[in-house]
Amino acid sequence: LSPHGHTDPQWFAADAAFGNATEPLLAPDHYLFRMLYSQGLDLNELGVGSRRGPSNANPREAWRKFAANFYLFNGTPSWLWLNYVFAKVFDLSVRLEASTADHYFDVIGEKLATPAFRPRALFERFNIEVLATTESPVDTLDHHHKIQNSGWKGRVVTAYRPDAVIDPEHEQFKDALTRLRELIDRYPLRGV
Protein backbone atom coordinates (compact mmCIF):
# COMPACT_ATOMS: atom_id res chain seq x y z
CA LEU A 1 0.00 0.00 0.00
CA SER A 2 1.37 3.37 -1.00
CA PRO A 3 -0.58 6.33 0.33
CA HIS A 4 0.73 8.76 -2.25
CA GLY A 5 2.43 8.90 -5.62
CA HIS A 6 2.95 10.99 -8.73
CA THR A 7 1.85 9.11 -11.80
CA ASP A 8 0.26 10.25 -15.02
CA PRO A 9 -2.44 8.02 -16.51
CA GLN A 10 -0.91 8.76 -19.92
CA TRP A 11 2.04 6.58 -18.87
CA PHE A 12 -0.24 3.53 -18.67
CA ALA A 13 -2.37 4.48 -21.66
CA ALA A 14 0.64 4.72 -24.00
CA ASP A 15 2.86 2.21 -22.16
CA ALA A 16 5.87 3.80 -23.84
CA ALA A 17 9.38 3.60 -22.43
CA PHE A 18 10.51 6.56 -20.39
CA GLY A 19 13.18 8.52 -22.23
CA ASN A 20 15.47 9.24 -19.29
CA ALA A 21 15.72 9.39 -15.49
CA THR A 22 14.31 12.90 -15.30
CA GLU A 23 10.95 11.98 -16.88
CA PRO A 24 9.61 9.58 -14.23
CA LEU A 25 11.69 10.57 -11.19
CA LEU A 26 12.15 14.35 -11.18
CA ALA A 27 9.73 16.19 -13.46
CA PRO A 28 6.46 14.82 -12.02
CA ASP A 29 7.45 15.12 -8.35
CA HIS A 30 6.45 18.50 -6.99
CA TYR A 31 8.06 17.73 -3.62
CA LEU A 32 11.44 17.50 -5.31
CA PHE A 33 11.20 20.55 -7.50
CA ARG A 34 9.63 22.67 -4.74
CA MET A 35 12.63 22.00 -2.51
CA LEU A 36 15.04 22.80 -5.34
CA TYR A 37 13.08 25.92 -6.28
CA SER A 38 13.18 27.07 -2.65
CA GLN A 39 16.97 26.93 -2.91
CA GLY A 40 17.05 29.18 -5.97
CA LEU A 41 17.06 26.64 -8.80
CA ASP A 42 15.02 27.61 -11.86
CA LEU A 43 12.17 25.19 -12.57
CA ASN A 44 12.80 25.39 -16.31
CA GLU A 45 16.37 24.23 -15.76
CA LEU A 46 14.99 21.21 -13.89
CA GLY A 47 12.84 20.11 -16.80
CA VAL A 48 9.66 21.30 -15.12
CA GLY A 49 7.34 23.50 -17.15
CA SER A 50 5.75 26.63 -15.80
CA ARG A 51 2.77 28.82 -16.54
CA ARG A 52 4.79 30.18 -19.44
CA GLY A 53 4.86 26.76 -21.06
CA PRO A 54 6.84 23.53 -21.11
CA SER A 55 10.51 23.41 -20.27
CA ASN A 56 13.15 23.03 -22.94
CA ALA A 57 15.77 21.89 -20.44
CA ASN A 58 18.27 19.22 -21.32
CA PRO A 59 17.23 16.19 -19.20
CA ARG A 60 20.83 15.27 -18.35
CA GLU A 61 21.58 18.81 -17.20
CA ALA A 62 18.40 18.84 -15.12
CA TRP A 63 19.45 15.53 -13.54
CA ARG A 64 22.91 16.94 -12.79
CA LYS A 65 21.37 19.90 -10.97
CA PHE A 66 19.13 17.54 -9.03
CA ALA A 67 22.06 15.26 -8.11
CA ALA A 68 24.25 18.17 -7.01
CA ASN A 69 21.49 19.24 -4.64
CA PHE A 70 20.25 15.82 -3.52
CA TYR A 71 21.85 16.38 -0.10
CA LEU A 72 19.06 18.89 0.60
CA PHE A 73 16.66 15.96 0.96
CA ASN A 74 18.65 14.14 3.68
CA GLY A 75 16.23 12.72 6.24
CA THR A 76 13.08 13.51 4.26
CA PRO A 77 10.54 10.97 2.99
CA SER A 78 11.64 11.85 -0.56
CA TRP A 79 15.25 10.98 0.30
CA LEU A 80 14.22 7.66 1.87
CA TRP A 81 11.97 6.72 -1.04
CA LEU A 82 14.43 7.70 -3.77
CA ASN A 83 17.35 5.90 -2.13
CA TYR A 84 15.16 2.80 -1.86
CA VAL A 85 14.23 3.07 -5.55
CA PHE A 86 17.83 3.69 -6.59
CA ALA A 87 19.06 0.63 -4.66
CA LYS A 88 16.22 -1.86 -5.11
CA VAL A 89 14.83 -0.97 -8.52
CA PHE A 90 17.91 0.31 -10.35
CA ASP A 91 20.65 -1.59 -8.44
CA LEU A 92 22.63 1.57 -7.72
CA SER A 93 24.86 1.37 -4.65
CA VAL A 94 26.84 4.61 -4.76
CA ARG A 95 25.55 7.84 -3.27
CA LEU A 96 23.78 10.25 -5.64
CA GLU A 97 25.76 13.47 -5.81
CA ALA A 98 27.29 15.72 -8.46
CA SER A 99 30.15 13.29 -9.20
CA THR A 100 27.79 10.33 -9.72
CA ALA A 101 25.02 12.15 -11.59
CA ASP A 102 25.97 10.90 -15.06
CA HIS A 103 26.43 7.34 -13.80
CA TYR A 104 22.93 7.38 -12.32
CA PHE A 105 21.45 9.01 -15.42
CA ASP A 106 23.04 6.41 -17.70
CA VAL A 107 22.22 3.34 -15.58
CA ILE A 108 18.63 4.43 -15.03
CA GLY A 109 18.26 5.36 -18.71
CA GLU A 110 19.54 1.96 -19.86
CA LYS A 111 17.06 0.16 -17.63
CA LEU A 112 14.16 2.43 -18.58
CA ALA A 113 14.78 1.56 -22.24
CA THR A 114 14.03 -2.12 -21.59
CA PRO A 115 10.55 -3.71 -21.78
CA ALA A 116 10.77 -4.64 -18.07
CA PHE A 117 10.72 -0.95 -17.16
CA ARG A 118 7.74 0.16 -19.21
CA PRO A 119 4.89 1.54 -17.08
CA ARG A 120 2.59 -1.47 -17.31
CA ALA A 121 5.45 -3.91 -16.67
CA LEU A 122 6.44 -1.98 -13.54
CA PHE A 123 2.81 -1.90 -12.40
CA GLU A 124 2.69 -5.68 -12.66
CA ARG A 125 6.19 -6.22 -11.24
CA PHE A 126 5.26 -4.33 -8.08
CA ASN A 127 2.01 -6.25 -7.78
CA ILE A 128 -0.08 -3.08 -7.71
CA GLU A 129 -3.75 -3.87 -7.32
CA VAL A 130 -5.13 -0.40 -8.00
CA LEU A 131 -3.55 2.97 -8.68
CA ALA A 132 -5.51 6.21 -8.35
CA THR A 133 -4.44 9.30 -10.26
CA THR A 134 -5.82 12.75 -9.53
CA GLU A 135 -7.60 14.71 -12.22
CA SER A 136 -9.41 17.99 -12.33
CA PRO A 137 -13.17 18.13 -12.89
CA VAL A 138 -12.45 19.52 -16.36
CA ASP A 139 -10.27 16.61 -17.43
CA THR A 140 -11.91 14.55 -20.17
CA LEU A 141 -10.23 11.38 -18.83
CA ASP A 142 -9.12 10.35 -22.31
CA HIS A 143 -6.12 8.43 -20.94
CA HIS A 144 -8.32 6.54 -18.49
CA HIS A 145 -10.70 5.60 -21.29
CA LYS A 146 -7.77 4.38 -23.38
CA ILE A 147 -6.52 2.23 -20.48
CA GLN A 148 -9.98 0.73 -19.93
CA ASN A 149 -10.40 -0.06 -23.62
CA SER A 150 -6.90 -1.50 -24.07
CA GLY A 151 -7.60 -4.97 -22.72
CA TRP A 152 -4.86 -4.56 -20.11
CA LYS A 153 -5.90 -5.93 -16.71
CA GLY A 154 -4.18 -3.24 -14.62
CA ARG A 155 -6.55 -1.06 -12.63
CA VAL A 156 -5.80 2.67 -12.90
CA VAL A 157 -8.66 4.82 -11.64
CA THR A 158 -9.25 8.53 -11.38
CA ALA A 159 -9.67 10.41 -8.12
CA TYR A 160 -11.52 13.69 -8.12
CA ARG A 161 -9.40 16.75 -7.39
CA PRO A 162 -11.80 19.70 -7.42
CA ASP A 163 -9.41 22.48 -6.34
CA ALA A 164 -9.62 24.46 -9.58
CA VAL A 165 -13.44 24.74 -9.52
CA ILE A 166 -14.17 25.20 -5.82
CA ASP A 167 -11.44 27.60 -4.72
CA PRO A 168 -12.12 31.13 -6.03
CA GLU A 169 -8.50 32.05 -5.28
CA HIS A 170 -7.11 29.21 -7.39
CA GLU A 171 -5.16 30.63 -10.34
CA GLN A 172 -7.25 28.61 -12.81
CA PHE A 173 -10.65 29.16 -11.14
CA LYS A 174 -12.30 31.30 -13.83
CA ASP A 175 -10.98 29.28 -16.77
CA ALA A 176 -11.81 25.99 -15.04
CA LEU A 177 -15.42 27.06 -14.39
CA THR A 178 -15.79 28.08 -18.02
CA ARG A 179 -14.38 24.74 -19.17
CA LEU A 180 -16.60 22.83 -16.71
CA ARG A 181 -19.67 24.58 -18.11
CA GLU A 182 -18.60 23.64 -21.65
CA LEU A 183 -18.15 20.00 -20.64
CA ILE A 184 -21.52 19.90 -18.89
CA ASP A 185 -23.17 21.32 -22.00
CA ARG A 186 -21.38 18.79 -24.21
CA TYR A 187 -21.97 15.75 -21.98
CA PRO A 188 -25.30 16.30 -20.18
CA LEU A 189 -26.32 13.81 -17.51
CA ARG A 190 -29.00 11.47 -18.71
CA GLY A 191 -31.89 10.43 -16.49
CA VAL A 192 -31.22 13.05 -13.83
Predicted segments — roles?
Residues 1, 5-192:
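Metal-cofactor-binding active-site regions of metalloenzymes
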